Design a protein with these regions (language model features):
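Conserved PLP-binding catalytic core of the aspartate aminotransferase-like
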Residues: 179-197
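Short, hydrophobic beta-strand segments
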Residues: 16-17, 146-149, 189-194
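A generic structural motif
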Residues: 20, 151-155, 197
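Active-site C-terminal subdomain of aminotransferase-like
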Residues: 72-177, 181-184
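Conserved PLP-enzyme active-site core in the AAT-like
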Residues: 1-114, 178, 192
Length: 197
């Protein structure tokens, strides 16, 4: 209701975190509908591992998806370096900053990934470049690429399923000793507890 009352023609976009700060899964489809009815763009900030068990931002109608790549095999390294990711609908693709990776086939029919829309890059048109990538970011991107290739779709799904089931198990066990879970509805792998202790 709050969103319906506050989103109007003056709203540029609505951004939600899914799962949110407390671990809750938002009513993402409904939020997307409200946002689009107002003519605004819908942006979802997602935990990439959660996508193994919840719908993708595209399935919720998001125009843009963003997130932190740290859960994808990057160690916690005193605050960085990390990498972020950003994806958009094809209609919005040319408005994205940074380097865009596309899927293609080589002359032998093998799947490959390439940097696409190269005319936007520093080495082609420095004065109009929309990216600035340094070697640390490239190293993080390589590490995430290796992690994703190693895990595959089933590995990501298994990691997400284990994270969710273990969080729900912990929530149930904590409830036995007086810590009640405050989350309303479904949560992914984070949750809030309270206790009289």
């Amino acid at each position: 209701e709050y969103l319906k009352e506050h989103v109007d023609a003056q709203t540029a976009c609505v951004l939600i975190q899914h799962p949110n700060y407390y671990g809750n899964l938002e009513e993402a489809a409904e939020i997307g509908e409200i946002t689009h009815v107002a003519g605004a763009k819908y942006v979802m900030n997602v935990n990439p591992i959660s996508l193994g068990v919840v719908k993708t931002p595209a399935e919720y109608g998001a125009d843009v998806a963003v997130g932190e790549g740290q859960p994808l095999g990057l160690s916690i390294a005193f605050g960085g370096p990390y990498l972020g990711f950003m994806a958009a609908t094809q209609k919005m693709m040319r408005n994205l900053p940074g380097r865009i990776v596309g899927q293609t086939e080589d002359h032998n029919g093998k799947k490959g990934y390439v940097l696409t829309l190269q005319a936007r890059e520093q080495h082609i048109r420095r004065e109009k470049a929309s990216s600035n990538i340094c070697s640390n970011q490239a190293l993080c991107a390589l590490a995430v690429g290796v992690y994703l290739a190693t895990m595959g779709n089933e590995g990501i799904k298994k990691a997400a399923t284990l994270s969710t089931s273990k969080a729900h198990y912990l929530s149930a066990e904590l409830a036995k000793v007086g810590y009640q879970t405050e989350n309303k509805g479904e949560f992914f792998h984070e949750f809030v507890t309270v206790s009289d202790v």
